Amino acid sequence: MPNNTLKQGSKIENVSPSKGHVPSFWKQFINNPKSMSSENITVPRSPTSLSRNAQPTTLKRPPLSSRPYSYNTPTKDRKSFSKSAKQNNNNNNANSGTSPHAEFKNYRDMFLSNRNGFTGRVFGVTLAESLSVASAEVIVQSELVSFGRIPIVVAKCGAYLKANGLETSGIFRIAGNGKRVKALQYIFSSPPDYGTKFNDWETYTVHDVASLLRRYLNNLAEPLIPLSLYEQFRNPLRSRPRILRHMLTHEVSHPNANKTNNVTVKSSRQNYNDDGANDGDIEKEDAKDDEEKRRRKIRHKRRLTRDIRAAIKEYEELFVTLSNDTKQLTIYLLDLLSLFARQSQFNLMSGRNLAAIFQPSILSHPQHDMDPKEYELSRLVVEFLIEYSYKLLPHLLKLAKREQQERLSTENKKNNGDKQKTDPIEIPKITSSDSPPIVSSNKNPPAIDNNNKLDHTTLSPISTSIPENSSDLQTSKMLKPPKQRRPHSKSFGSTPVPPDVIASNKRRTSLFPWLHKPGILSDTGDNGDLTATEAEGDDYEEENVDPYGQSPSSVHSGSLPKQHYLPIPRMNRSLSGNSTNSSFNTRPISMILTSGNDNSADQLELLSNTHSNNERSNALPLTEDDGDERNSRSRKRESWFQRLTSRSGSANRA
């Protein structure tokens, strides 16, 4: 029986209070003075504390939260509890030697850094380190100038938001899904491409991308405006309270913003027409008051405009003091936010709302986090930069373009100076000639083979006015090889003869379609040697070229007129069509420079004489073997053409 009574008693003691008794239980617990005491709780040091020699350790009672799980706690008890909690915190802070503000900041920073779990070298690091890992180039569309570089994650998110999120309601204010944002963060933090090739946005929403952009900017090691320039960026508006009052009382917006949703209230004065004797005097006084108000308004507007222009001028000078990486990212971000502010009638995110969201990442200071006045001034500065970015950005873009041109010019000078010291280029001797220059302008010029063992010389444009002493050219400045090959060369002659241009390098004659074209006109770009048959076919084709369309004329008759062809030695030459402005009736001969012989000028003179007299001459001697081969080939071609002409003549006679 005693055992049964003990069991029943233990059961009664373990019964928990019902839900209805919970509020009364908490009232009794809080009103109990022992529950609020800060007395120490003795805890034995080891399990063998039952011995007499055991020394207990002291632990402080943890403070309870001001709002327990029951919402029926009286306000009086909550106030008394909050006072006691503050006293306990003050005692603890006095013992530790740190202020509550510093402890809260440390706890907040630790929580933010550990909450997102940043890994890698993109998120949660300095801007310079993030750019060294993954960066994208920004190009200004209006001027096609490379403005600078920004992080890949900012470039990708900005491009996606511009295309899909301009009219999304609550953009940047509504948070995205945590899992999806973390997945995007992992993509842009993973090597080797760090999200450069990522384009699979279908599984993510606009708010996910906006949250990723905010997360990157908020977790930079330092705000975009560095702490050393924090006060300097706030001074232009702090020293002009007229601008601050205007921004607090009026909604500042871009002049091109669509304001279809904005409510405009116009003050309307009700005029009472009473038949009194003093109606005329009242109307005069009202007119004077209206005129005075209008003058005040105009005067205030002029002063406000003057202050705004002066502030913009100061900000232009301040942006120059920023580093290139910070300046480029800040300008890109201001331009992005101004686009969303212009669409505020759809996305409900005006410049004021956007400034409140992005102010911590653009302009903030750790000592002013808990100060509402300082926070408001920083927010107004960011709002001013967003709304008047259309005034700031053109000037900054001009500065960036000027700096880029200066940098390129200095690099070119250094490169040219190094090349002058290391690789001087000799100019070959060139003699004057009466024939106009022939210029080849193939769209796809053949590649130069440096391993070719044949003797070739570079063809340079020849002018009709060349000094007699060729030594002057050699003593002049050395030419520099161009970095990129031009699609065609230009004539530098003094005569107003435009260069002939070959329209296409895929022309085929309708008379000899099986013949191989010379190397300079072939699609493969081979620099093969010209045979007499190929040269004759080219000459026949170019004599039948339409001077207006520069296309080969079609031959309808089966007869071939008797032609006199000039044998051409082995050489590299430039081909061209007929020039409509040229005074020559026939195609001018190409100027050929050969490096195998020293008498290149004599060869040019001989070729020009043979062309002017229209007489057939023998080929210029190069070597004995080459001359024998060409003579045998020419005899075969002459017999072949004679048979062809005899057949066509007999057919016509028949």
Curated annotation (Swiss-Prot):
The modification Phosphoserine is found at S37, S46, S435, S491, S632. Disulfide bonds: none annotated. GO terms for molecular function: GTPase activator activity. Residues 1-101, 249-298, 407-504, 516-597, 609-654 are annotated as: Disordered. Residues 407-426, 629-640 have a biased composition (Basic and acidic residues). Residues 1-17, 29-58, 255-273, 430-444, 457-477, 573-597, 642-654 have a biased composition (Polar residues). Present with 1420 molecules/cell in log phase SD medium. GTPase-activating protein for RHO1. Must be involved in the normal assembly or function or both of actin. Plays an essential role only at low temperatures. This is GTPase-activating protein SAC7. It comes from Saccharomyces cerevisiae (strain ATCC 204508 / S288c). The gene is SAC7.
